[in-house]
């Protein structure tokens, strides 16, 4: 599997005061809902690379240059887009885990991981970020539990 289903998806309610609007850096690559972003000097937010440590939050929505809701930010210098970013450091997220031979177990709780920046879905606007390996050192994500998906 090359990409995930949803990137980082919030679990539970999101605090309204933690949803902040940021301009999107127009020289950036495409950004999708569920992508981790960083501040890019005075240009706005940009998609954060996998091992980045100065992340501002996770994108939960977009507005285009006309102020209309957009599924994602298209690459190629599209100007005037705004990203809605969840900046709450206490927000819990679920993310797709994929490994060819190792499944997650309760013993993995407490591990850390960096996400892989996958290809987002232009039809749904969902991120392609996922996790493929766990560790015990410093990383951008921590496993706090296993999410039981129904259905």
Outline where the language-model segments fall.
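Surface-exposed, low-hydrophobicity beta-strand/loop segments enriched in small/polar/acidic residues
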Residues: 1-151
């Amino acid at each position: 599997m090359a990409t995930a289903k949803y990137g980082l998806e919030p679990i539970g309610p999101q605090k309204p005061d933690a949803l902040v609007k940021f301009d999107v850096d127009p020289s950036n690559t495409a950004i999708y809902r569920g992508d981790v972003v960083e501040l890019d000097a005075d240009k706005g937010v940009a998609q954060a690379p996998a091992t980045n440590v100065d992340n501002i939050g996770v994108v939960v929505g977009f507005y285009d240059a006309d102020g209309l809701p957009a599924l994602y930010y298209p690459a190629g210098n599209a100007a005037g887009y705004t990203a809605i970013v969840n900046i709450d450091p206490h927000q819990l997220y679920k993310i797709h885990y994929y490994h060819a031979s190792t499944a997650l177990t309760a013993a993995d709780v407490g591990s850390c991981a960096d996400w892989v920046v996958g290809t987002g879905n232009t039809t749904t606007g969902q991120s392609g970020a996922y996790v493929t390996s766990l560790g015990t050192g410093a990383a951008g994500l921590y496993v706090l539990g296993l999410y039981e998906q129904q259905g």
